[in-house]
Amino acid sequence: MTDGSIKSESLNLVEGYQYFQEKWLNGFNDKNSMTLSSWICNAKLVNSNNLLLQMDIEGAEYESIITTSESTLKQFRIIVIEFHNLDYLRNERFLNQRFVPVMRRILQNFDCIHAHPNNSSPIFNICGFEVPKTLELTFYRKDCNEGTKRKFIPHEKDIKNDPMQEQIY
């Protein structure tokens, strides 16, 4: 785990099973930030190919994924990312330099197996499509994905992010 906003002393970690660094995950390394590949190296997980990545980093997910090599991404069996700022999809620069490259990078080796729109932020109409500002996507590595591919939304375990707002699908 890594999070620049949390002090490790406040966590009840099980030594040998959990690893934590007080840094932001980003597309570069400095005293406060690190790349995904640096985190894997620091956690001594470079030989693993069965990792789970859950990323909710408020917009830094794009730079983090763009700067991560294909071989590093393939160390993860499952990737769960909350994508922010999707209202910018109407901006060509964001679409072509951030969103599309990230999706291409991930979909090269992963299948999207679940999509959950966040109902706590507004919906935008972009080219006739209703798009949430924030969307959580779950990806499963293709070489591990032997299950039946079914399309159904919502999933029975989906819950609202904001119980006071209507669910969006």
Where is each model-derived feature located?
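Conserved acidic-Pro-Pro-aromatic motif
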Residues: Y17, W39-Y169
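SAM cofactor-binding core of SAM-dependent methyltransferases
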Residues: M1-M34, N42, S48-N49, D87
